[in-house]
Amino acid sequence: NLFQFGEMILEKTGKEA
């Protein structure tokens, strides 16, 4: 799902930041 993918990216970016 696109939503799930976006959520995963957000979490990844948040962890990276």
Swiss-Prot record:
The protein's name: Phospholipase A2 1
GO CC terms: extracellular region
Cofactor: Ca(2+)
Cofactor note: Binds 1 Ca(2+) ion.
Family: Belongs to the phospholipase A2 family. Group II subfamily.
Disulfide bonds: none
Compartments, as annotated in UniProt: Secreted
Main function: PLA2 catalyzes the calcium-dependent hydrolysis of the 2-acyl groups in 3-sn-phosphoglycerides.
GO biological process, one term: lipid catabolic process
EC class (word): hydrolase
Top-level taxon in the UniProt lineage: Eukaryota
Distribution of this protein across tissues and organs: Expressed by the venom gland.
Keyword tags: Calcium, Hydrolase, Lipid degradation, Lipid metabolism, Metal-binding, Secreted
Coiled-coil segments: none
Molecular functions (GO terms): metal ion binding; phospholipase A2 activity
E.C. no: 3.1.1.4
Reaction catalyzed: a 1,2-diacyl-sn-glycero-3-phosphocholine + H2O = a 1-acyl-sn-glycero-3-phosphocholine + a fatty acid + H(+)
